[in-house]
Amino acid sequence: MKPVKKKKTEEPELEPLCCCEYIDRNGEKNHVAACLCDCQDLDEGCDRWLTCQSLRPETCERITDTISDRLRIPWLRGAKKVNISIVPPLVLLPVFLHVASWHFLLGVVVLTSLPMLALWYYYLTHRRKEQTLFFLSLGLFSLGYMYYVFLREVVPQGRVGPTQLALLTCGLLLILLALYRAKKNPGYLSNDKSPSNSQIECPVKKGQEKTKGFPGTDASGSLNNRTLKDDVRGSSRVGLDSPAKVKEDWCAKCQLVRPARAWHCRICGICVRRMDHHCVWINSCVGESNHQAFILALSIFLLTSVYGISLTLNTICRDRSLFTALFYCPGVYANYSSALSFTCVWYSVIITAGMAYIFLIQLINISYNVTEREVQQALRQKTGRRLLCGLIVDTGQYNRGFLRNWLQFSTLGTHTVHTPAEDIV
């Protein structure tokens, strides 16, 4: 008898998702309308809370994961997941500002608490080394909401002309354009080296293990009398005998050769060329390719913010100077419109003061040709020259004078110095 050929079982084709359906974290099809169904972890957490029992950490993590997975909006070909960290600013900021405009004392309490809550959340996420869209959402929504209050409460009073409104609108648009440019690639290092340079398998010697890296790297990971741990922690990449000579280091995490002043960002999980710092306000690193756009965004924001604050105070506190109106504006709480505008002014002042401090630090660092990461490393290791209680730190490694430092900053990203890997072995 001839053997019977078995027919190949055809896998069923997946049906296209409608706008409200999605594939959840368990790989099953789910619906947006069922977001409150089958919440075992949430039920368990509520039961333990009602019975005054402690909630286990793993239960809290599962509840957070479930909420973030089910928080979606209808979209074409399936519901899209919404990052839960962008929601609190959209909901809480208008509520807090409206509550603060009810009374002077409420305004003091709320406007004092907001920076503290933001700092608490920053240190919480910074300690976990996690990316968050909270601060980017807070910044963008603050810009939009302040502009909305200005159009609704300040412009109708007739003291803001069309030219002034056009200037403020152009400033807002320029801020968004500069932020868009600053959000782009800060100078990520890609692992495009050849295998002979980036992944060299060392021969096995007696007393050594097979490792990947540069020739001469033993089992302890030493490289040129330094360990890979030192490279990850940020050992100096400038030779003592020739400070101007650029050397390159090996990143054990990205498995690539990084040039001088590059650093591995533990939040982004990738190496950045001439990394300055990881900025939570743009949810990205500030590096060689976007440092100029970052400074431009800060400068435009400060000018636009001060201009908007002055226009608002001249409208609600007439015939008073800008500084006097901030602290003494009689009758500002007499009606709700002026009270809300005055509260938004003080909120803008707090944000502007914080950004002005960041801008000042950036100007000082550029003038001394140091990055923020190099400053923090010098403060920890108690090296370099410190002035004004550590506000100014000069490491002395790359400082070539004020004009040359700014000239080098103005040409960032236009050329890149490459050093062969053989030169550092």
Swiss-Prot record:
Disulfide bonds, paired cysteine numbers: none
Region (Interaction with NOS1): 422-425
Active site, UniProt feature: C279
PANTHER family in alphabetical order: PALMITOYLTRANSFERASE ZDHHC23, ZINC FINGER DHHC DOMAIN CONTAINING PROTEIN
Cytoplasmic domain ranges by topology: 1-81, 126-130, 181-292, 365-425
Predominant subcellular localization, coarse grouping: Golgi
GO cellular component: a single term: Golgi membrane
Catalysis: reaction(s): L-cysteinyl-[protein] + hexadecanoyl-CoA = S-hexadecanoyl-L-cysteinyl-[protein] + CoA
Entry protein name: Palmitoyltransferase ZDHHC23
Location in or out of the cell: Golgi apparatus membrane; Golgi apparatus, trans-Golgi network membrane
EC number: 2.3.1.225
Keyword hit for Metal-binding: no
Membrane topology: Multi-pass membrane protein
Native source organism of the sequence: Mus musculus
